[in-house]
Amino acid sequence: MLENLSTEHRNEKTMNLDEMSIKEILQSMNEEDRTVALAVENEIEQIEKVVQTVIKSFEEEGRLIYIGAGTSGRLGILDAVECPPTFGTDDKMVQGFIAGGLKAFTKAVEGAEDREELADEDLKSIGLNEKDTVIGIAASGRTPYVIGGLKYANRVGASTASISCNKNAEISKYAKINVEVGTGAEILTGSTRLKAGTAQKLVLNMISTASMIGVGKVYKNLMVDVQSTNEKLVERSKRIIVEATGVSYEVAAEYYEKAERNVKAAIVMVLLQCEYGEALQKLKEAKGFVKKAL
């Protein structure tokens, strides 16, 4: 029942929200937002287990699949679509599904989140299998679409995890690993796009970033698998080579082109003074880890 969910409770500090000045509203929001990172901190051990599971999927050429409805679904898609430009993944490695399909990203699809079978259809469409990890996201922790997706994932043998913002969440019953971030009452009662949404975004940032580091997508703290899809990213790629190797910008630009715009290969070529083909071979043997290739 909704009344039992902490995310649906009224916030005692904001009973007079409609009488506050603009500055007071903003200060109240900021004060509440400060509690979110602390709530996430309490779940670090559970998030670590999720990351370990996702890394295992990636190592077995499996995928990370987010499922959610409304804000939760949008946040999953947002995290998924940032992975290709940031980490050089293909668009299948991390995917997000939202109840009602992609059209629901910009406009609510009535009743979609209440249908478990829609998640079945979405996950069947990508051939979900035992190598994959499915993460169900629901602030309330009770969304039928998410529950349906987790049930289906369990049936096909995929790994499962859940992210909710209520303790003892319903979706936790259907996932092997549960992240329950207790964000509490929102300043605007029941508006879980606020603190709950912020918490979910923080957790998703952690999962995707730490998992990508775990499969060699990062050297030191540099995103060496960045895809140069625009001028800004081309410049960033050259700067990454400068930072990683200590060479001048001009030398970095030269090796960037010699390496066919492969930042990892360029770094290995500079530091080991080898040819492009040899750099690729070393990276292959090191399973993509620059540090091991060196």
Curated annotation (Swiss-Prot):
Involved pathway(s): Amino-sugar metabolism; N-acetylmuramate degradation
Lineage top rank: taxon: Bacteria
GO molecular function: carbohydrate derivative binding; carbon-oxygen lyase activity; ether hydrolase activity
Root EC class: lyase
Residues annotated as domain SIS: 54-217
Pfam families registered for this protein in UniProt: GKRP_SIS_N
Catalyzed reactions per annotation: N-acetyl-D-muramate 6-phosphate + H2O = N-acetyl-D-glucosamine 6-phosphate + (R)-lactate
Alphabetical UniProt keywords: Carbohydrate metabolism, Lyase
Annotated family: Belongs to the GCKR-like family. MurNAc-6-P etherase subfamily.
Subunit structure: Homodimer.
Function: Specifically catalyzes the cleavage of the D-lactyl ether substituent of MurNAc 6-phosphate, producing GlcNAc 6-phosphate and D-lactate.
Protein name: N-acetylmuramic acid 6-phosphate etherase
Species of the source: Bacillus cereus (strain ATCC 10987 / NRS 248)
Organism taxonomic ancestry: Bacteria, Bacillati, Bacillota, Bacilli, Bacillales
